[in-house]
């Protein structure tokens, strides 16, 4: 029985020492925060998991109507272009802006991730941004316009380059 108490004490001591060492690693500058290097896999996983859990918890808005409305999707394409989303995320027939290549983590390819996101999550990310990723907050933009962007992003994989070009022409 005595050995169980000693084993628990040893486990507790290892946990305390490990926590102090881990905190020291981050707090005293040993962890490299340079954007020129990718994070270690475990850090990238932890950050992505934290990001997704936070977005899922805070994203409570519901679309004001159908996001399948063609007029809403077209308006979203125009807003997507005018607000500069295309610079980091690209668009049908349009590559990322050269300057966005230095962002870490890389801006997501929306065609690939949209199937794994709910509209409420996309809305929250556009409205609030994501800290330490380069994704700015667009909270100053009217919610209706943000929903049009969400509608467009939901269809981005099916929009042709010609459609995007026609839809993203600024209105006079």
Set out the residue ranges of the language-model regions.
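Extracytoplasmic electron-transfer domains, predominantly the class I c-type cytochrome c fold
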Residues: 102-158
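Periplasmic c-type cytochrome electron-transfer domains
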Residues: 2-74, 78, 137-153, 169-172
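Short, flexible segments with low predicted structural confidence
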Residues: 47-48, 97-98, 120-121
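Extracytoplasmic/periplasmic copper-protein system
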Residues: 160-172
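Short glycine- and Lys/Arg-enriched binding-loop motifs that mark or flank ligand-binding interfaces
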Residues: 72, 89-93, 125
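Periplasmic/extracellular electron-transfer cofactor-ligation site
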Residues: 77-104, 131-137, 156-162
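N-terminal start-of-chain detector that recognizes signal peptides
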Residues: 38, 58-60, 81-86, 106-109
């Amino acid at each position: 029985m005595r050995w169980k108490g000693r084993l628990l004490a040893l486990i507790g001591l290892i946990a305390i020492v490990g926590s102090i060492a881990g905190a020291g690693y981050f707090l005293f500058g040993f962890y490299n925060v340079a954007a020129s290097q990718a994070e270690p896999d475990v850090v990238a996983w932890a950050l992505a998991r934290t990001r997704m859990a936070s977005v899922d918890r805070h994203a409570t808005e519901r679309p004001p109507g159908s996001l399948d409305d063609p007029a809403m999707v077209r308006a979203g394409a125009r807003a997507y272009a005018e607000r500069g989303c295309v610079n980091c995320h690209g668009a049908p027939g349009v590559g990322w802006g050269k300057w966005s290549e230095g962002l870490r983590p890389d801006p997501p390819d929306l065609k690939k991730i949209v199937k794994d996101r709910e509209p409420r999550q996309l809305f929250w990310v556009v409205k609030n941004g994501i800290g330490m990723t380069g994704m700015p907050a667009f909270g100053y933009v009217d919610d209706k316009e943000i929903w049009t962007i969400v509608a467009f992003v939901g269809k981005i994989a099916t929009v042709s380059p010609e459609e995007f070009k026609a839809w993203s022409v600024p209105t006079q």
